[in-house]
Design a protein with these regions (language model features):
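Gly/Pro/Ser/Thr-rich low-complexity, intrinsically disordered segments predominantly at protein N-termini
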Residues: 1-188
Length: 188
């Protein structure tokens, strides 16, 4: 039986999942996963709260197995932390980093606080002057940290829509399509 989850965890999980889902709906070749077993190695099969990945046919670093599990690291993993904060910020962070996850987002309920690691850049993704965090791996994935933490969905949605309308997001979508076309050409 799974560990019991508090209402606050479910609420934050749903809010963050909605952001990632909207992003993936507007970005062909990207999908959002919710509590999916992810095979990272022989002894590492975590079930992250949320993940955002580039599909393998678009050049992503993970793939779907015949049994419909994800094998290999998703580009972004997100955890909602309450009682698991220490584990999420230390052991899980190290496991995901070593496995090749490129960005790791922890939404800490206590505080509340949004902590976003960019592993390839060896640093954290911090909010700009307006409180907006911008993914380096998924251009246009903009999260208004104060709005998310305060539960102001309309403001967060407006910021994400702005990110999805950005030139960076448009260029990313074109890059994904070119990768897809190139990979498809190799298979035929």
């Amino acid at each position: 039986m799974a560990s019991p989850l508090r209402r606050s965890h479910g609420r934050r999980h749903s809010q963050l999942g909605s952001i990632l889902q909207l992003y993936s709906e507007e970005t062909q070749g990207v999908e959002t996963l919710d509590n999916v077993t992810t095979i990272l190695g022989e002894e590492s099969e975590p079930q992250p709260d949320l993940a955002l990945r580039i599909l393998s046919e678009y050049g992503g670093q993970s793939r779907e197995t015949a049994d419909e599990y994800v094998e290999g690291p998703p580009e972004l993993v997100a955890e909602v932390a309450h009682s698991t904060r220490a584990i999420d910020l230390h052991q899980k962070r190290l496991d995901y980093q070593q496995a090749g996850v490129r960005e790791y987002l922890v939404l800490c309920i206590e505080g509340p606080e949004l902590i976003w690691f960019g592993f390839r850049s060896r640093g954290r993704i911090v909010p700009d002057g307006d409180g907006v965090c911008r993914s380096r791996v998924f251009p246009g994935l903009w999260i208004d940290a104060p709005a998310l933490l305060a539960g102001i969905g309309a403001r967060q949605s407006a910021v994400l829509r702005k990110g999805l309308s950005s030139p960076e997001h448009s260029a990313f979508v074109r890059r994904l399509q070119r990768r897809h076309d190139k990979l498809r050409g190799k298979r035929t």
